[in-house]
Regions:
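PRPP-associated nucleotide enzymes
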Residues: 1-194
Length: 194
């Protein structure tokens, strides 16, 4: 099954995942659009279809382990591991005192080939933090898989990177944000503080 860009966007819109307002994103930048992938992840069949489509781009890369940052990367890592094979493990990183860490007795074995996955990227900072953890454990990052790249393709991770959908949604530094200048309160919907 090949999923078309228009079909993906339509499903995200139908699920209420494309939200309008004034948002302070996890990366600290502001935007008038927020993509809440949890609204799509509550539909396992569609999530499986999305991850199957993305997973096709990594078949043959001999992946041992998939790692995603909490919260959005947890479900995605699990589904991607199921798509890529019965022996592919799935784990996640999470924040502890504001720092991305590997907990819950999860291990990355030396030399393991790792695919890092994320639901939405804007600046790529969470993915880079996960990549740093993998490298610090002597794992080898062989790729990055992203459902939605909202940077318009500007983020470069230095490894094979596949995105299911690339959109260019305007972001602003807080001091340059037109919504802040109008006095519109910003909502912080992300999971960085969790």
């Amino acid at each position: 099954m090949i999923i078309k860009t228009e079909e993906v966007m339509k499903k995200f819109e139908e699920a209420g995942a494309i939200q309008k307002g004034h948002f302070k994103l996890t990366s600290g930048v502001h935007s008038d659009t927020y993509i809440q992938c949890a609204q799509v992840m509550q539909h396992p069949g569609f999530m499986h279809n999305l991850c199957s489509e993305l997973g096709k781009k990594f078949r043959g890369d001999d992946i041992d382990l998939i790692v995603g940052p909490a919260i959005g990367g947890i479900i995605m890592a699990h589904v991607m591991a199921r798509v890529l094979g019965p022996w592919v493990r799935a784990i996640f990183t999470e924040r502890e005192n504001g720092k991305m860490t590997l907990r819950r007795s999860f291990e990355i074995n030396q030399g393991e080939k790792v695919l890092v996955v994320e639901d939405v990227t804007t600046t790529g900072s969470s993915v880079r933090e996960v990549m740093d953890i993998v490298k610090s454990r002597q794992g080898k990052v062989v790729g990055v898989g992203v459902l939605i790249d909202r940077s318009g393709g500007k983020v470069n991770f230095g490894v094979k990177t596949e995105k299911l959908l690339t959109v260019d949604i305007k972001t602003y530094l807080p001091e340059e944000c037109p919504l802040c200048k109008k006095g519109v309160p910003a909502i912080k919907p992300g999971s960085r503080e969790l």
